[in-house]
Structure formats: C-alpha cells, structure tokens
Amino acid sequence: YGRGVFIGDITPLQEVSAEILVEPFHLFGIEPRPYYGFRALGNFHLYGHKYLEVPNEPDGLVINYYLREAQKGGATITIKDISGVEVASRTGTSEAGINRVLWNMRPGEDSGGDGHSGFRRREGPPPLAPGDYRITVEVADERATMIGTIRERIW
C-alpha cells in the first residue's frame, strides 16, 4: 500500500549505550502506567483490507531486559509490593539481546491475558491497586530490581 507506518515501543533502545552492551545483563527502566481495561463493542473487521488498524499498547507494565549471551533456562520475574510481599510472578525468555515480558498488573503467576483487552468476560483476579511494586528479574546468576509503578487512572 505504500504508506505503511510501523509503530513500536523503542524505549529500551533509547536507553542502550556502549556500557550496557558489554554488561552480561541489564534491566531497563520500567515506564509507569495506569490500568485502563480497554473494551470495544462491534465488529471492526468488516471493512476488509481498506481499514487501517493499529492495536493499542498492551494494558500492563512492560519489563525489558538485555542479555549479552543466551542463557539456559528462562528468566524469573518476581513482583512484590512495597512491603515485600510477593504479589505476582512471571517467566521470560533468556535469549541474547533485548527480552520483553508483560505484567498485566494482576496478582498471581502468569495470570491470564497478554495485556490486550477486548469485549469479553475478564478471567482472573482484578488488577492490583495503584502504587509502587518491586520488580526483580533473575537470569542464571544475574539479578536486578527496579520499581514499577501502577498509576491511578485519571479520566
């Protein structure tokens, strides 16, 4: 069609430097986000190939980390509230390069959903309250912790 546009989150690329690329492991900053819970009603696929559609950003906190070399086994992501109580956990890839895991802001282990919303009944527990959460990524012998913030939704 000739006028295509690629939309992608390049946040980790903006943070990359020569120093990071020589490290065996690096956890990038985590952008604070509110939980939106987008929903849509209707069949928007009736327009065929003439309808340009770009999906919304995922509804969750995106955790990006860099590995200089691929590691055996996956990454373990642990999310704790500010008092140190574990509220969620995820597993991630351990491939060389930038790896990405989405936390859908819900408690539990890999608890339902890829962060994309639609018009359907939600499965799993409701999202956690706004606030700061300690997010720890462990791969092989490497470990790093960052604060991830669920912001309050303001409309």
Residue ranges and their predicted role:
Residues 1-52, 58-61, 66, 70:
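Beta-propeller blade termini and top-face loops
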Residues 46, 51-53, 57, 102, ...:
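Extracytoplasmic beta-rich repeat domains
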Residues 50-57, 69, 142-155:
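Primarily secretory-pathway and cell-envelope proteins
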Residues 58-64, 98-100, 143-145:
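Intrinsic-disorder/low-complexity, polar/charged segments enriched in Ser/Thr/Lys/Arg/Asp/Glu/Gln
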Residues 61-64, 70-88, 132-136:
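Beta-strand-rich binding/interaction modules
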Residues 86-126:
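Glycine-centered tight-turn motifs at strand-turn-strand junctions
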Residues 109-113, 139-147:
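Short acidic/polar inter-strand loop motif in beta-rich domains
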